């Protein structure tokens, strides 16, 4: 018989840096999950990801207080800012450009995000990533 799902918890945690402090501790604590067990498992699973990148995670909590979790790829905006070498996007994206990304960088980000995106093909995903870049005030070259 399958376990009864009690809750789904969605968080963004820095890769390799999960610790019991907020936001992780309170979110898991209110469902009775072993916080340190999650932190150790999450940090082990995100070893291959660049340290510090915000990584979305969906935690499924069961009625017996056990849990499973799925890590996703970092948000496209974070990957675009890293590729362009800027700290933040533009406050006025249509008039004020803050950086540039090449078509090759957009392709690389689309391939990274392919597992989480629901695009028909890589070209559709590239267009989606390029749209995100433009809405952040980045110029897409190529």
Swiss-Prot record:
GO terms for molecular function: large ribosomal subunit rRNA binding; structural constituent of ribosome. It comes from Photobacterium profundum (strain SS9). Part of the ribosomal stalk of the 50S ribosomal subunit. Interacts with L10 and the large rRNA to form the base of the stalk. L10 forms an elongated spine to which L12 dimers bind in a sequential fashion forming a multimeric L10(L12)X complex. Pfam families: Ribosomal_L11, Ribosomal_L11_N. Keywords: Methylation, Ribonucleoprotein, Ribosomal protein, RNA-binding, rRNA-binding. Forms part of the ribosomal stalk which helps the ribosome interact with GTP-bound translation factors. GO terms for biological process: translation. One or more lysine residues are methylated. This is Large ribosomal subunit protein uL11. Belongs to the universal ribosomal protein uL11 family. InterPro entries: Ribosomal_uL11, Ribosomal_uL11_bac-typ, Ribosomal_uL11_C, Ribosomal_uL11_C_sf, Ribosomal_uL11_CS, Ribosomal_uL11_N, Ribosomal_uL11_N_sf. GO terms for cellular component: cytosolic large ribosomal subunit.
